[in-house]
Amino acid sequence: MINRRKFLLSSSSAFALTQLPSDVDAKNGIKHYKLVAEAAEHIFYPNAQKSKLSLYNQQSPGPIIHAVKGDILEVDFLNLLDEPSTIHWHGIRNLNEMDGVPGLTQPAVEPGETFTYRFPLNDTGLFWYHAHTQAWKQVTKGLYGPLLVSDVNDETHHRDVLLVLDDWLLDDNEQLQLDSLGSLHDWSHGGRHGNFLTVNGQSKPNIEVPSNGQCKLRFLSAANARIMKFELNKKIPMKIIAIDGSPCAPFAVEKLTVAPAQRYDILVEDSSQLEELIEVSTSERLTAASFSTTKKTQEKFDVNSEHKPWYPHPQTTHAKIIDIHMQGGAMGNLAAAVFEGEEKSLRDLAQNDAKLWAFNGEIGGYGLTLADIALGDTVILRVWNDTRWRHAMHLHGQHFWVNSKEFGERNRQVLRDTYLMQPSEKVDLIFTADNPGL
């Protein structure tokens, strides 16, 4: 077994957002990193008892992986947990065998074992990496981190302000509540909601921003289920310039809704006005972070040249249409579903199999194939969220356009990998199948 000291040559023990040092093979364009998943302890409040977390490199969030478009990313992953794990590279149009889904694209990485992820970075933007084995537990305990891919000519990093969001469910001792992980109540009610908000692993941090110029706020939600909504002090307009990593034609919103796994890049025209980031999804307005200014800058982002989707909206005249009927959860419309070849009542599924959700009347395993799609086909996933719960829908290996009411006509200019579906909503997720895989 490889020990942590030998595997990880250097890391920070502080619970703050830091960049992971890399070994660069310039000749071959390879960026090499090391990630260790292991048990960790963390104190959420002064004088509180220690919480038992699982972290990458003893950091919360995991360290920033920063690379340049065109690089080959190579990450040596060491699993020092007492259970299997893998890493999914969320939002990356990845090689199938590098996608991190245990039992489908790779075997799970067993305790004490290593696995090397190696894949090209073909798109710029903000992505993230997270555990994909029992993600309901491992991600909730802290196994996630940001992945930032820049353009080789981008000289604006000093004005990027990364905001990694999470909400944690703490008990009366200010410790992460572990006993309720995987509870049927959470699974049937749209997921686990916390009661303690962190930004970059801290409660109400003070974050430095450049003064007298533009800055870019880059939001990433690692929450299990909570759908957050933010505004800035004085209701400063937030100009959306990228969604899920992909640039879009800029448009302003007063409040920004961020679902689990979504990312938004927000352009603030005058950063000297920034004072607070406020969470406003409930009647209680919460200060999520405060801002203070650093050195002056008069530089500006060239949004006209930069902010176009990676590729154009496809023609859909001859698209392959795949219907997906999503049912389940509490107060839903699922009475029974087929699981492992047998139709069972929802009560039976919940009590004996801990299964509560179904697509097209079936509870999927990796032995079921939704559809066979030819390379290059245009596909419309016609999804009906026939439940009482909002749900963030994510595609692996593909980005898509959405035909919905959320951004109206702007949807044709917005490319995503995660979309927040409303209860009873019907939407079309449209993509070109240009990345082979399962």
Go through each PLM region and give its residues.
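N-terminal export signals
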Residues: 5-24
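Extracytoplasmic beta-sandwich strand-turn segments characteristic of Greek-key/jelly-roll folds
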Residues: 60-67, 89-123, 203-205, 238-272, ...
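Hydrophobic or amphipathic alpha-helical targeting/insertion segments
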Residues: 117-153
